[in-house]
């Protein structure tokens, strides 16, 4: 597999609408402040703070979109976790790996909706996901409804929007490949 596999327009129109509507309806509930622990040379240390929404109990995410991930990637997965990441200006993520075990993958689905992030505005909004691969930093634009699949041991971080009053949303799937 290539290091990163990108899927533009991952969800069809109705699925994207339903997903965006879910976050719009639940904006004022369900987002909890969260500080991830990140691995450093001296052990685990607190990373930067951002927002997190548990999605594992929602069938839209834990079943329907998971099946779409499997269909589009031609892989079968066990779902380890799924949650929403939320970031506002100043909440850049820390460099980290999600899982160092063999056969684990992360799938990110960008779902920022106010505004929709697309090719005409991404350069002023920011919110890239940075990947450190073979000594290079590769930034992936967080276009709304774009999916990115990568092995969970790749060092990466989510960058916050450059402008205030924008809430960058990505859905993070933690997956174990079934072989």
Please place each PLM-identified region on the residue numbering.
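Non-heme Fe(II)/2-oxoglutarate
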Residues: 1-76
